[in-house]
Amino acid sequence: AQSVVFATGFLKDGRIDLDWPMLARPRQTVVIYMGISRLADICAQFIAHGLPPSTPAGVIERGTTHAQRVVVADLATLAQRVRDEGVRPPSLTVVGSVVGLYPKLAWFEPEAQPKASPLPHAGCAVVHGKAGD
């Protein structure tokens, strides 16, 4: 991708009035926050404004937490896959070829993350690394 764009997927009145021609440009990554409830409309708008239905897309639910889940598909099937998986907010939707790198770059696997370790002398916890690092 040559650029990245962040956009909100939910406006106060419930509309998603975005600059779709700008968002649907090739060779860019689009990240949409607060858009899970309108995901079918969002995917349809990308396709209507020129992105191929086969464009990689994914949703990250509860990113970087122990409850993180990732659903990867294409624009044509993402909304249904997300419904089938029961994905809920908070989540980010990512659209663009960068999503195709997910299998290679899936560095975050919640079950592999270290658990918090209490430090009795400090009254805090170490989440990554070891006490004394």
Model regions and ranges:
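A contiguous loop/helix-start segment that scaffolds small-molecule binding in enzyme catalytic cores
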Residues: 3, 8-133
